[in-house]
Every structure is written in C-alpha cells, then in structure tokens.
C-alpha cells in the first residue's frame, strides 16, 4: 500500500451497539474477548452458528459508551437482524449508522507517522475525535479510519493523502489471505476456525462460552483442522461457486468465493503444511 494513498471502503457498513447490558451481550455471542476492547485497542471477531459455522465477521471498536462493529455492508442488515434476535430482553440498543459513517484505509507507514501511533495490531487512537485503528487482523493491511461522511474530505486533505480506488486495497487484502468481499458466500459452509480466525487474532480460546464455542474448541484441541480458506489465483477461464479443485486428479478443495478476489476451502494433504 502506498503511504500517500487513502482508500474509501464503500463496501463496509457500521453498526453501533450500546446499553446497560452491552458488554455481557456481546461477550456471550462472539469469538473474541470483548473485555480487551478499550479506547486504545480494537479487536477482530466473528459471530458463528451454534455448530461453529461462519456467519459474520467484524472489527469491534470502543466508542463512547458502546461499541462500533465494522462489517461488510452487504451483510449489515442480516447482522442487525441476527443481533436483535439474540437481544431478547437485554438492555441493548442496536443502530445502523452505515449512512452516516464510512471506513477508509491508509497504509501502516502513514499510520505510524501520526503522533502517538504504536506498531501494534489493534492499536487505536483518536484523529480529530474519530477512531483510527491499526488493523487487528494483520498490521500490514494498514489502518482504518472510522469517520463521519461529512468529515471525510477534510480529513483526506489534512492528512495530505490521495484518494484511490478501493480495488487496490482489496487486491492487497487478497494477497494477505484476508477475505473481505462476498463473505456471505461463506455462511454456513465453513467452520469459523477454517477461516483462519485464530491466525487473524479473531478467536480467544481462554474466554468463556460463546455461540459455536464447543465445536471450535474441539477442532482446535483435537487437532482436527484439515482445511483452510485460502486465496486462489485464476490463470485462465472462469471460476464457478462450489467448483471443485484438483491436484494430480486428487480433489483438494472447492471454490467458495468466485468473484474478483477468489477464495477456496483447501484440504491439507501434508499435515505439516504451514
């Protein structure tokens, strides 16, 4: 990523959760430990099915008396509905602020040039009252600015950055093996732990129970992880969703995301594969 560029990620949506029971509510649902999320630290997490299958993933940022969830926009309405199903009588308010706030990405180098910035995944600080986060999944993916739409142009000028197409950012994310687009195609098809969430700092195996915890822990503790979500490159032709992948006539996986930045669930033929 170029130090002088900024990428407005219009594919991201924003939920804001607050209320008397908000910490307990999130802690009982998601894969990471919400107690770790502070004004200066944000984390990556996911919401799974009771069987441990993937549903949603997001970055959680502390904001005022609640939490911001930065999620793929095409999934935001479904995530909003799912959280409201779990809410029941909890004193929790869930707001969709996707039309008011946006997410913009800058390079790690630009982030570290800002005053008081630290080279730590998830490190969070304020820039003109807006949160800016060094990506908790992989700091090489740069930092994310969660900002009111009306303030975006002013901040871009003040930071002396050039706006570029988000495709450059997503291409780099694909190279790093982090799926951020068309993640709805993963729903109920793949275990959360197969999405590399442990490697992306998205699962805390020491926290208490959460939705899907039993299967996730079993796969981890019994060393049952034999498949992973990996980026693939199309050399020729076209990819189809659920298309099988072969190596020397042996089926090793299938395509799950077949769009511009494709991913496939790949089996390990070698247990020592890193």
Regions found by a protein language model. Give the residues of each.
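Anionic-ligand-binding alpha/beta catalytic cores of soluble enzymes and soluble regulatory domains
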Residues: 138-229
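Short, intrinsically disordered, mixed-charge
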Residues: 27-35, 77, 81-89, 116, ...
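Glycine-centered loop/turn motifs
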Residues: 40-41, 116-126, 238-243, 274
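Acidic, proline/glycine-enriched N-terminal capping motif
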Residues: 1-57, 61-64
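Acidic, low-complexity central loop/insert segments
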Residues: 5-9, 13-16, 59-176
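Short amphipathic beta-strand starts and helix->beta connectors
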Residues: 1-2, 43-57, 87-88, 124-132, ...
């Amino acid at each position: 990523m170029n130090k002088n560029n900024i990428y407005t990620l219009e594919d991201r949506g924003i939920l804001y959760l607050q209320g008397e029971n908000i910490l307990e509510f999130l802690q009982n649902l998601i894969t990471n430990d919400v107690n770790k999320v502070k004004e200066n630290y944000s984390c990556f997490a996911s919401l799974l099915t009771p069987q441990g299958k993937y549903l949603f993933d997001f970055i959680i940022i502390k904001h005022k008396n609640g939490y911001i969830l930065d999620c793929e926009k095409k999934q935001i309405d479904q995530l909003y509905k799912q959280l409201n199903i779990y809410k029941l009588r909890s004193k929790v308010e869930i707001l969709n602020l996707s039309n008011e706030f946006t997410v913009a990405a800058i390079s790690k180098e630009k982030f570290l040039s800002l005053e008081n910035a630290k080279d730590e995944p998830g490190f969070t600080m304020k820039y003109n009252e807006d949160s800016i986060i060094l990506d908790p999944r992989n700091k090489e993916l740069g930092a994310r600015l969660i900002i009111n739409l009306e303030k975006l142009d002013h901040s871009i000028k003040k930071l002396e950055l050039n706006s570029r197409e988000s495709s450059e950012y997503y291409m780099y994310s694909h190279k790093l093996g982090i799926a951020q687009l068309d993640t709805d195609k993963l729903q109920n098809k793949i275990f959360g732990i197969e999405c590399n969430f442990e490697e992306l700092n998205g699962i805390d195996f020491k926290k208490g129970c959460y939705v899907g915890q039993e299967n996730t822990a079993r796969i981890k503790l019994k060393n049952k992880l034999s498949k992973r979500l990996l980026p693939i490159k199309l050399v020729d032709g076209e990819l189809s969703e659920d298309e099988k992948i072969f190596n020397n006539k042996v089926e090793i996986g299938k395509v799950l995301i077949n769009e511009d930045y494709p991913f496939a669930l790949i089996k390990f033929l070698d247990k020592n594969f890193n």
